[in-house]
Amino acid sequence: MTLTPMEDKGIIPNFNDFKRQLAELLQSRSTVEDITLLQGFLQLVHSKTQQWRGAEGLPATPDLLDAVWKEIHYPIFKWFQQWRAHLLEAAEGGPQERTYISFRRMNGKLNKIFKIIRQFYNGLVQQLFDRYDFGKLLPAGVIRELNVQSGGELQTLDDSSYFTILCVMSLQRCLLYLGCCHRYKCCCSKLSKRFHISDFDDSMRYFMLAKQIVPSVGETYLQEGLVYVQTGNYGHAAYAFMRGSLSRMPTDAGIPNLESIVADASSGLFAKHQGILKRLRSKESDSNKLINREVLEFYFLALFSSVYAPESWSKQGSDIRHCTEILFEKVRSRYARNVRLILQDVLLFIGGFDLVIKKAKAMGLNRSDTLPSNCTAFLETAFDFFSHVIDSVVLKEWQSFDTWEYLALVRVICVWIKSHSIVTQFAHRHTQFCQSVAHLLNNILAHTEYQQLMDVEHRPKRDYFFQEDIMLKDFSAIGHTLSDFNDVDLFQMENLPDRLAGLVDDKLTAKEEGLLKLHAIVFIGKKFLANNDVNIVWCDESKRFNSLKPDVPLRTCSPPKAKTPPPSTSDYTPAGAKQTKKSKPKRNSRRVQSLSSLEAKLMERKGLRQSVAEGRVYSGCSVPAAPMSFDVAPSAHLYQDRAAGTSATQEAATYYNQGYNGPMQLGSTEILNSRSPSGNNRIAFHPSHQAYMQMIQTPQPQAWPTAYGHNAYYSQPTQHPYPMSSQLAQFQNGPIPFVAGPYAMYMPPPGPGMVVLNNGHPMIPNESPPQQHYP
């Protein structure tokens, strides 16, 4: 096989020969008996790969690494995963002693193959550091964590060149695939089906390093989410999938995986989440058995799911209202050891709204000036939760500076409101949230130690990123960074990579950092309350925000532009039965004639939620055995029902990644108070197959391209099986079918023409790149 350098003809190595040889090996009984055949094959592939050199002698480019993983390493790991599944199936009806012996033999062969693959990626990492100086691009702490030895004269990488992008992205790929290798090894090396997060410490370490180097790649979050799926932590998995789909370089598999947990009732993960909720409900009578962390993870996920995909959850057999009450009580009483999880819940609401808006846009519901009622219900639930968190957690602990999450909760919420016009308009009309923010600011300004914050007129400055800023790098729902600080001077300082990682010698104390954060919170909070629509105003005499009184007339606004949609003609009873509304709507009607009546209903929203929540019900933990055929890639979503046709989560992958050209205008005051969609305005979260066919373009045949360019990246996970013959692989305990699906890494088109690295600089190449146009 001939490997042509990229700079000569722009052709990447063709792995067709290797793919054919691998298919023959994996379907041969001799490979099972003698693993040295597979070892020799891997050594040959690695040797040929390392002989190829990219631009300026780069050991490997990101595309070359993607090809090696997709065509060689990933099918091998899936082969071992299938072997393990076969042994587990045989163990159910056969002698246990024979199963253990077979498993030890399989595990020994897996360890030999794993060492060869790990050595390949570690060797490439060492080669990169042997040739190039990453000091201007990576934090010193990350380089120390990699434990690489640099020697001799190194080429300094310029953070404005295209070649630097290739070097950094190649390093990121090596770390990402090292994490994937450790994940598959852990999954295959245990005979038990139960896993703990500590089993994947090595995988999570490499994923964390990959995020620190290039935080904008969503694939890293996707792989973290797959780890959490394996351990049964579906709340953490949902957050990771959301982050992966809302990164600057998103993965198209994030949304389908998320919906497998929270929206697709036919998914195995959805059913497992329901089972966990039923198990927790049975433990509520005994407080000693009910684990607070499980409530904050799984009960919150049920609340989030009920407004993210109400059509899927309205048919379940449990009460969301009861679940919400238990959740709110645990937030109020058990937040101290779970504040990081509460912050994650807040972020899931923030990211989830972006996904709901994208879904509404894809369904063509942004053509009017009215915010869809599904989006309104989502915001209402989210801000109820935010208000409760501020009142029950932040108001008590805002001076506990040693725990950075308390002030981070307020910073994240306020920045999100400021960066999204739809959310801003809604938040200005949410009475309880405005009151919560006003009470928090009053408490801060009433403290004698912080009197100087009363007259702040500018955002504060700082010399390095704080922990929450590092955590939320390239999170598109908040504008890719927390913007409540003025960081213009920061980006001009020396040792910028270390500063953006929070690794500086002259680091402030926790209290000094807290004072800067309070400055930012007071500034952005006063800006927010200056335009509220619930009549909370600043009093110059008392230097406080006044308290909202029900008898104070509310500020009026212009009437909505769009026509008021008709009220729903039907609703659900607590049992799920459909009933026809008989007469004129009563106090809980969703028709609002003026802003004053809207605010009155917002003040009574607890009563409103009581009537509507009765119609919302929910009801889900271990990981199933490996599938009997591999017709999905690791980036693809889980638990597709092939026999039933295309699943809802599979259909959702296409329209979620459509461009989002900005938020819609909120023009209707009637729709703001609507807790659930009416019959005529409900968003179909699982539209019909015909409706999807009108939105989804016909997929093109996917094959590894012969040249660099836009076609060099897969726009979606491949649905075509790995080309292998139909011969059955022979195992010691009998034949077992094998079809491996290729791995497809989604890389979006380089629209902005830049990659943001960990040093914060947008990488806009000054030179004309080779034929490859890498984002």
Curated annotation (Swiss-Prot):
GO terms for molecular function: telomerase RNA binding; telomeric DNA binding. InterPro entries: DNA/RNA-bd_Est1-type, Est1-like_N, Est1/Ebs1-like, TPR-like_helical_dom_sf. Its main location: nucleus. Residues 579-590 have a biased composition (Basic residues). It comes from the Eukaryota. Residues 550-597 are annotated as: Disordered. It is found in: Nucleus; Chromosome, Telomere. Keywords: Chromosome, Nucleus, Telomere. GO terms for cellular component: chromosome, telomeric region; telomerase holoenzyme complex. GO terms for biological process: nuclear-transcribed mRNA catabolic process, nonsense-mediated decay. Belongs to the EST1 family. Involved in telomere maintenance. PANTHER family: NONSENSE-MEDIATED MRNA DECAY FACTOR EBS1-RELATED (PTHR15696:SF37), SMG-7 SUPPRESSOR WITH MORPHOLOGICAL EFFECT ON GENITALIA PROTEIN 7 (PTHR15696). This is Protein EBS1. The gene is EBS1.
